[in-house]
């Protein structure tokens, strides 16, 4: 819901291509109604949206739902990003000492870091990997390792992950795609094993850093 309200041009692009766009949680699904009853006034979360999407897909003939982050096959698919970055570094004759990426559920972070991280595991490299997560949703920094659901309503299979709890309702921030309660299972295990560090950053600090970077560049 927060993205629906904050980013009107995105929904207009979708509507241009014929989509019907509904903010989540909504009154259009049973799970949406339950979430709104339990959390009146909530701005929603990725977990809420997943629950509603799963219900819609499973109750509409001919439709399937595919999770776009968190799960291992998604994280590994995204590594094309890091493989390209690795090749670019090779062409430049350099190699990173640190790799930093934002972290919501893990697909973006895994995509850029995993190709480099394998060299720490197999070739003795000492690159540092830092997951930057929002302070309002610090699943890697403060979450507990558990088997948890990937959505608010508990419709997905249980997933081993660092999690704040599938019922966690994060506060409203601009980067709505990072407002997810858990981390992908491979990333969660690598955090537990000490291969990945995490840092939880407040939104205001992020904006200040973005402005500094833009002006310095």
Predicted regions and their residues:
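Short glycine/serine/threonine-rich phosphate/pyrophosphate-binding segments
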Residues: 5-8, 102-113, 139-141
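Active-site/ligand-binding loops adjacent to catalytic centers
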Residues: 34-73, 93, 118-121, 126, ...
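A glycine-rich, Thr/Ser-enriched phosphate-binding loop motif common to dinucleotide/cofactor-binding enzymes
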Residues: 69-84
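Buried hydrophobic positions in well-ordered alpha/beta secondary-structure cores of metabolic enzymes
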Residues: 14, 53, 85, 99-101, ...
């Amino acid at each position: 819901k927060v993205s629906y309200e904050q980013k009107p041009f995105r929904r207009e692009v979708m509507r241009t291509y014929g989509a019907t766009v509904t903010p989540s949680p909504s009154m259009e699904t049973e799970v949406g109604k339950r979430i709104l009853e339990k959390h009146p006034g909530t701005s929603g979360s990725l977990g809420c949206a997943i629950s509603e999407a799963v219900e819609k897909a499973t109750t509409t003939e001919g439709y399937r739902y595919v999770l776009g982050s968190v799960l291992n096959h998604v994280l590994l698919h995204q590594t094309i990003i890091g493989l390209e970055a690795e090749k670019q570094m090779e062409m430049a004759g350099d190699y990173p000492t640190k790799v930093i990426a934002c972290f919501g559920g893990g697909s973006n972070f895994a995509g850029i870091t995993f190709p480099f991280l394998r060299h720490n595991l197999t070739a003795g490299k000492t690159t540092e990997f830092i997951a930057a997560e929002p302070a309002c949703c610090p699943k890697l920094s403060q979450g507990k390792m558990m088997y948890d659901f990937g959505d608010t309503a508990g419709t997905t299979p249980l997933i081993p992950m660092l999690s704040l709890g599938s019922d966690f309702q994060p506060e409203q921030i601009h980067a709505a795609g990072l407002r997810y309660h858990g981390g992908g299972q491979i990333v969660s295990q690598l955090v537990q094993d000490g291969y990945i560090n995490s840092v939880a950053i407040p939104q205001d600090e992020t904006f200040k850093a973005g402005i500094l970077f833009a002006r310095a560049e």
